[in-house]
Amino acid sequence: MVIKAQSPAGFAEEYIIESIWNNRFPPGSILPAERELSELIGVTRTTLREVLQRLARDGWLTIQHGKPTKVNNFWETSGLNILETLARLDHESVPQLIDNLLSVRTNIATIFIRTALRMHPERAREVLATADEVEDHADAFAELDYNIFRGLAFASGNPIYGLILNGMKGLYTRIGRHYFSNPEARSLALGFYHKLGTLSREGLHDQVYDVVRTYGRESGEIWHRMQKNLPGDLAMHSR
């Protein structure tokens, strides 16, 4: 087990998460007693208690007053906030995880972008207009792309879409910094934002579905060509 966390709390958190992932503490099992676990990891019981509370909030554990702490099946109890952690734990599955993430983005974007352009066109155009001043480099485009999708999600009037994008932010922007290092990807994205702006101005809301789907397919083709050179630190994150 290789743990790169810098603080005692970060070390304890990664130790427990990796132990769950590697079935040292399998789903459905009971964690060792607090005293035993703190000695095993090498942190104070106060630090361990804080870590356990945080992991419980993220869905990894269930803490019940007066009862042992139970390990959850995190696939059933956690949220999008653990995406980066999953990518870090299983490097071989990162391409599939990213494919799934981008597929979800495209599927829900066909709904919230159409709604935003139809119900709140002025707000949608304000969001899309931010692309006019973007600097031509990967970091700027990664931030822009996330903010445009998130902005349109909230412009749809249904904040749940925005919350979903919030949950994707960490891994989404890390992917974006690699993806948008390709000039072809940046050019395709600008064309996509421009098309959406045109559809909004002309009231062609029914064409949003096809435009978003086409962009998802074409950007996916670029991404798949780039997957052979995924940076090793794509999902690295330490507390």
Swiss-Prot record:
One GO cellular component assignment for this chain's record is: cytoplasm
> Where is this protein primarily located?
cytoplasm
Q: Outline the extent of the HTH gntR-type domain.
A: 6-74
**Which regions of the protein are recorded as binding DNA?**
34-53
Identify the domain of life: Bacteria
Database matches in Pfam families: FadR_C, GntR
UniProt GO BP: fatty acid metabolic process; regulation of fatty acid metabolic process
Matching Gene3D superfamilies: GntR ligand-binding domain-like (1.20.120.530), Winged helix-like DNA-binding domain superfamily/Winged helix DNA-binding domain (1.10.10.10)
Query: Does the keyword Mitochondrion belong to this entry?
Result: no
Q: Which UniProt keywords apply?
A: Activator, Cytoplasm, DNA-binding, Fatty acid metabolism, Lipid metabolism, Repressor, Transcription, Transcription regulation
Localisation? Cytoplasm
Xref: PANTHER family? FATTY ACID METABOLISM REGULATOR PROTEIN, TRANSCRIPTIONAL REGULATOR, GNTR FAMILY
Q: How does it assemble?
A: Homodimer.
Q: What does this protein do?
A: Multifunctional regulator of fatty acid metabolism.
Q: Which HAMAP family match?
A: HTH_FadR
Q: What is this protein called?
A: Fatty acid metabolism regulator protein
What species is given as this protein's source? Cronobacter sakazakii (strain ATCC BAA-894)
Q: What is the primary gene name for this protein?
A: fadR
